[in-house]
Amino acid sequence: MPKVKRYKYKNIAAALAILLLIILGISTSCSSKADSPKKISASSSNSSAVKADSSSKKAVKKLTGNYMYVTAKNKTDMVNGDLILVNGDHSFTGTVNNTDTVYSYLFDKNGSQIMSTSSTQLTAKKETFEAFGKMGNDFYADKKISTLMINTAMPAEDDEDSSSACYEHDTGLAFDLHLYDSSTGAYPEFTGEGDYSWISENCWKYGLILRYPEDKADITGVSPMAYHFRYVGIPHAEIMTANKLCLEEYIDFVKDYTFEKPLTFTAFDDTEYSVYYVAADKGSTTNVPVPLDDNNNERPNTISGNNVDGYIVCVNMTENAAPADSSSQTDQQA
């Protein structure tokens, strides 16, 4: 955190003018906070995330206090998780659990259908559809447009060709959007333009990213797809969006951060996170360090394989956050 310089003013009027400018600056910052992801400088390795008005926030606790190890099985755990990279060089060999069908996510809180689907039996991981449903509800609340249609998710078990156009659909973490105009019966393409630009501009708030942006085709190896969205989770989607990183770039970006020197980040909802990378050991397992709180409880965290060479850990460092559910971890060491 930069040192705060202190100045003495001989002229009281000058001091009041400076104070007024500061107040106006803070007011402007607060008014735009909810709509803008907070940027992190990708060039400053192991540095703290840039925070709006950081002087008023408590410092994120360091991770070098009490901690424990979670034992990850490299053969299975490294190829599963919300942040797995699936592309032409890294195929999906993991498993998909906790799935759901799309139908119940097409309605608002009053039970009115506000979105449509190409099939009520479309299937994906539950967290993917939960993010889609929340985003769709907020889009409808803001734009009063009910033409969004989810067109593709996981391929059917007996359809060998349904995922050939995109590497990611097998993971249960991706879906494609289309449009359906019930008044005309037309099915326009989802281009993400006009009112629909709201989707790509706000999807990060729900843990979603536009997976194949127009300016990243040389990195992803896939032509731009304005309709294809991928669930990566919170706060990863916000970090990626703020720094204009596609998933390939984010996988490399996180490798600059370790358990000893993590990326610390305050999300748009003021939740404090620490994110770091753990390289997979050469053996069959990897001991992944995760921090404990002051009561020696495991802090809420997620551990995702990257499907390349290791694990990405995200820890909720906010005070009074609910402890992690240790029963979900298969093998732990104190």
Put a short name on every predicted segment.
Residues S27-S29:
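C-terminal motif of bacterial Sec signal peptides marking the signal peptidase cleavage site
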Residues K3-A17:
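N-terminal Sec-pathway targeting helices
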Residues A17-G25:
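Bacterial N-terminal signal peptides
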Residues S31-A42, N46-A334:
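Extracytoplasmic cell-surface/polysaccharide-interacting catalytic and binding patches
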